[in-house]
Amino acid sequence: SEINHKELNGMQKGAWLEVLKGQFPEKAKDEIKILDIGTGPGFFPVILAEAGYKVTAVDYTQEMLDTAKRNAGNLCERISFYKMDAQNLEFEDDVFDVVISRNLTWNLKDPKRAYEEWCRVLKPGGKLLNFDANWYGYLYDEEKRLSYEEDRKSVESEHLDDHYLCTDIDRMEK
């Protein structure tokens, strides 16, 4: 999709790569075993494979894995793709140096079970990097609400598209 393409070619790609690399063990790239859970369109595996890492990517749906493979293109040789449930991983214990996930936890039926699984497949001393967001914290926190309103003003003053304006919270909470 256009969003995937922008993200994979935008400035945030380098920022994400630096954040991730800063958490990796100090050993050769080929020796670091990385698992991306809920890979979606394959953002993390693609940027990591471009940087010379080998990555295992899992997702619950074949459609997302197919999208990730398309996005990876010739980088697929550095990425292993598996259809798998994030809450019931089919890997042995203590396999990965790093487990990463982005924008997945809030979609899971049983996040506690997922975290148990993710920790199970991590090697002792491994790193679990979970990036998730509370997109609607501004509805419950006055400080976040003020920040949200300031962001809306900034977007308007820069004449940018504001995708937050059409969110129907009442419908989502039903």
List where the protein language model places each region.
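Conserved class I S-adenosyl-L-methionine
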Residues: S1-D30, F43-I47, T67, K127-H163
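Class I SAM-dependent methyltransferase SAM/SAH-binding core
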Residues: L35-I37, P41-N88
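Short N-terminal helix/helix-N-cap motif within the alpha/beta-hydrolase-1
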Residues: E63, L108-R113, Y138
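A short acidic, Gly/Pro-enriched loop at the edge of an enzyme's catalytic core
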Residues: Q87-V98
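A short SAM/SAH-binding and catalytic strip from SAM-dependent methyltransferases
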Residues: V98-P111
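A short glycine-rich, Lys/Arg-flanked "PGG" loop and its adjoining helix->strand segment in the class I
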Residues: K112-P124
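Short alpha-helix
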Residues: K174
